[in-house]
Amino acid sequence: MFNEKLLTINFCAVDLETTGVNPAFDKIVEIGAVKFNLAGDKEDFHTLINPKVHIPYNVVRIHGITDEMVCNSPSIEDVVFSFYDFIKDSVLVVHNPSFDLSFIDLVFKKQGIASRRLWGLDTVRLARKFFCELPNHKLTTLASYLGIDCRNHRALDDAIVCMMVFLEVVKRSGLDENSTFGEFMNIHGARVNSKILREKSEIATARKIAIGKKITIRYCDTDGNVTVRNILPKEFIQYGKNRYIVAHCYLRGAERCFLESRIIGIE
């Protein structure tokens, strides 16, 4: 890929709106994506998603998406494969990729979509290099500077701004249609990865927990309440410095993520 000309590569700007900031616990409520190339071709993907959980008010204040707006929308399971087909042959372009890609990566893993750890190009990093005159590099600030009408903090609008920032960066960089992707990466720097990592052994070894083996745990929630739960571990994951166990929880009758450090006992 590094020797391919920029003109021949498909890019895809992606943005998500979610119920919170932690992909281990929070859910996606909207996906917006724009697939494009330097020749000017464009195609978009957009959907609201029913997260099957309440959207907190403090998050609604950011993106404006309410429970009522998503109650008749498809679930993530209904759209994830079509979304994967849309982005799979593209280089992803994201504003702060580690956030959005971690949500997407975990959803792909849960649905059994075989993909390498997701990575993308970071328009925050690029904006800091090429728009250093701005007071900050938020999408709203960049949109205003570039004369883009973006009044709503919504996924597709933000993906479009992300695409426009990327195209402006290419223009300002001095690269042309004969430049290679490798030359662009020399400007961008190292690609940005999802923060989601699979852990198949470390938690199991330390805590004597095995995938597919039902266990009983004592779990302390954020309020300090301790509950006894029967769980069936499905996967171990790591997000940042925190490790989680993805498991079927018999108490809730659904899949849950348990923070490993909050498990205070195993029977």
What annotation goes with each model-predicted range?
Residues V91-F108, L134, K138-K195:
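Acidic, Mg2+-coordinating catalytic module of metal-dependent nucleases/exonucleases
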Residues R117-A127:
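A short, structured active-site edge motif that brings together acidic residues
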Residues I196-E267:
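Core beta-strand-centered patch of the WYL/Sm-like small regulatory domain
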Residues M1-N3, V165-T216, D221-G224:
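Acidic two-metal-ion nuclease catalytic site recognized across multiple nuclease folds
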Residues L16, N96, T123, P233, ...:
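Residues immediately flanking
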Residues M1-Q111, R116-L118, C132, L139-N152:
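Conserved non-catalytic scaffold segment of RNase H-like nuclease domains
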